[in-house]
Structures are given as C-alpha cells and as structure tokens.
Amino acid sequence: MGKQEVKTRQGERVAIVAGLRTPFARQSTEFSQVPAVDLGKMVVSDLLARTDIDPKLIDQVVFGQVVQMPEAPNIAREIVLGTGMNIHTDAYSVTRACATSFQSAVNVAESIMAGAIDIGIAGGADSSSVLPIGVSKKLAASLLALSKTKTLGQKLKVLSGLGLKDLMPVPPAVAEYSTGLSMGQTAEQMAKTHGITRAEQDALAHRSHTLASQAWRDGKIAGEVMTAFPEPYKKWIAEDNNIRHDSTLEGYAKLRPAFDRQYGSVTAANSTPLTDGAAAVLLMREGRAKELGMEILGYIRGYAFSAIGVESDMLMGPSYATSKVLQSTGLALSDLTLIDMHEAFAAQALANVKMFASDKFAQENLGRSKAMGEIDMDKFNVLGGSIAYGHPFAATGARMMTQTLRELKRRGGGLALNTACAAGGLGAAMILEVE
C-alpha cells in the first residue's frame, strides 16, 4: 500500500475552515423536544452565519444520524432545504455508528480530492430524547391487514388475534443486532479481559470531567459552541450540561455497576451518557479557501477505518484504525502533538491505551513487529473527552475534529490523532495537521 495523500490531483490539500456544534445536553433535558434533524439545521445555519459564506456556494452536504427518524431519512437533504442553500446542492446521509461524522468528513474530503466539489459541509446529529418508538411485529402485520379490510366483521377478526402484550410500544434496540450484546456489556468484557480496574476507570472519568470543566472555565470551548434556543423557546442553552464541574474521585465510587451487578466495574459515571446534540465542519479545497479569504483551521493529513469481530473486544477499533493510519501516512505515535480518543466507556478507552503499547497485541493482531508505542498521557484527551462532554452518536467525530484543531492552533501547530470505536466492531482514525 502506497503512502496516503489527502490532496487533489493538482496537489491542493483538503482544508477544514471552521467547525461548530450545539451544546451537548443529557437525554430528556434542554433538547427534550428537538429532533435530530432540527439540531442539524440549527448548527449548520449558525455555522454558515459565523463564517459569513454565501450558502449558495456550498456544493455538497454529507450528514449522519445514527438513531434514524422514519419521517426524515435523509437528514442531509433536509438541512440543505432548511438553511438557505442552493436547491441543487448535493446532499446525502451516512451512518457509521459512533464514527459517523468522521465518515461524513471523509466523504466530503474525497469529493474534493476527486475534483467533484470545492466546498462541502460534513457532520452529524442525534437525539436520544426524540426517538422512533416502534410496535410489535404482530401489531405491525395486523395494521397492514386491517388497511385491506372492508367490513366491520373483517376488521374485528383481525383485531381479535391481538393480545395485550402485542400492543406494547417497542423502544429502539440498544444491543448489537448480530450478537444481542449491548455496548456496556462489551465494555465490561473488555475491562475483565484486559485487567482494567474500577479504580482506573473512575480515575479516567474524573480526569475527563476535570479537564473539560477547566477547558470551559479557560474559555477554550465557548468559541466552538453555539447558543441554542430550543423549542418551546422559553430558555437558551450555551454550555454542555453533562460536565461535572465539582467532580471528586470519591464520588464515582458510590455508583453500582450497571451491566454486571455482582462482579462488574462499568458504571453510569465512568461511561458516556445518552446525549442530544449536533456538530458540523466546513471543508474546502485549499486554493478555494484562500481565494475566498477564509482563515484555515487545519488540514486532513490522513484517515483510516477498521472492522473487527463483534464477539469480544468489539470496541478496540481505535487500536486497529490508528495502526492503519500511521502506516498509510508514514507517521509514528511520537510524531503526534495531541491524541484525542473517543471515550465511549473508560474501560474501552483504557483497554485501547493498553493495546497501543502491547508488542504481543501488535504482533498477533496488527501485523506489526512491535507496538505502536506508549501513549504520553500529557497528550491524551487534554481537554477532557466524551465521558464529560456527552456523546450524541453522529456528532462526536465533528466535535473532536474542531476541538483538536483549535487546541493545536493554540499550541502553535503540529499533528494530532482523532480516533473512535463504533458499534459493529468498527473503528476510525484521522490525522489532522495545523501549520
């Protein structure tokens, strides 16, 4: 495999010009009545206003949503129609579970590299509050049959076959379709398999909240978060509401395990909460950005996706995807100024950190003669991570990209890794560069 170059045929790089997100809100709080499509429109509309770019110049929108709403299956197109862009703007939706907005950003980048577009918007939105509540298979079949009946007798005959349990609503599935295991159960398995203790998990969660709280207090986050006025428009939200600004390590020990009550170590406090929110990034061909006089945040240097088995260690995607992107870009872990890893669970993040430094894991699973290297924790999730900020599934990647680029710029430039696990044994890794 040759060296990866994220450039057009003329040698122009793919620039990230701006990024923005809504505040992230815990399920059933400030965004309790706001569907994901409206969160997406909200953040893209504000992004266009802040960058002062003519919406008609946007060639393409690629957006994602993990928890799909049947009434708006193509969230990207709804965003185009709802934010004043040219009616002919190309728009399509993607999903890669928790790595969705990494995928949408890569899709826009590849369109730029191919010369198909000059300017695109990528991102994702999810609501854990406004969910599609389904019905049982038997009720669904009966409703279809009912629509084809003509007489009262025929209708009664169809309805007579339904029991009380058939009428119960069916919430969205939280388990893997292929295994029946939830993400939390997998995190629990990884903690046990890789010797990640409860104390280590709680310490990472405390670190995440402490660093995120400090980042907000230091004014590092406000510039990438819009003020939202959600329905019913009686109050606004300008900050994430999941961050524990008074986090103490002792407080985490009080919670009971959530997935293995007797022997477990994964709790609600050392996991990401269900969250509502949206995030987006504006990408351009480097030359076009300069023509428009846009300040460039940074560039995509490389990216990789991975897929592994789902029976165990399903959330080890960052280790596999990072190995691929380091190889394709010719970089080493030591070349990186910052490393930002999605914290789905403290157990998952710590297991990956451990495997980055494992020669045995590298030889048996990555095709490497030795480990990628030990992660310098002074470079790792320096502003806190998903455990603190929250995790609207499709929005997290765009949050990480914007947050990382802005922090790199504050530090005078360099290279950074963004990486995430995702359901289905998927993983994503992206190298970002700031001059």
From Swiss-Prot:
Recorded hits in InterPro entries, A to Z, give: Ac-CoA_C-AcTrfase_FadI (IPR012806), Thiolase (IPR002155), Thiolase-like (IPR016039), Thiolase_C (IPR020617), Thiolase_CS (IPR020613), Thiolase_N (IPR020616)
Which SUPFAM superfamilies does the annotation name? Thiolase-like (SSF53901)
Q: Where in the cell is it found?
A: Cytoplasm
Please name the catalytic residues of this protein. C98 (acyl-thioester intermediate), H391 (proton acceptor), C421 (proton acceptor)
**What pathway is this protein a component of?**
Lipid metabolism; fatty acid beta-oxidation
Query: Which GO molecular function, any one, fits this protein according to its record?
Result: acetyl-CoA C-acyltransferase activity
Between which residues do disulfide bridges form? none
Catalytic activity, as annotated? an acyl-CoA + acetyl-CoA = a 3-oxoacyl-CoA + CoA
Top EC class of this enzyme: transferase
Query: What GO CC terms are in its UniProt record?
Result: cytosol
What are the entry keywords? Acyltransferase, Cytoplasm, Fatty acid metabolism, Lipid degradation, Lipid metabolism, Transferase
Q: Which Gene3D superfamilies match?
A: 3.40.47.10
CDD domains assigned to the protein according to its UniProt record, in alphabetical order: thiolase
Gene Ontology biological-process annotations: fatty acid beta-oxidation
Its EC number(s): 2.3.1.16
Q: Which family does it belong to?
A: Belongs to the thiolase-like superfamily. Thiolase family.
Q: What does this protein do?
A: Catalyzes the final step of fatty acid oxidation in which acetyl-CoA is released and the CoA ester of a fatty acid two carbons shorter is formed.
Whom does it interact with, and what assembly results? Heterotetramer of two alpha chains (FadJ) and two beta chains (FadI).
Recorded protein name is: 3-ketoacyl-CoA thiolase
What is the native source organism of this protein?
Vibrio vulnificus (strain YJ016)
Q: Please name the gene that encodes this protein.
A: fadI
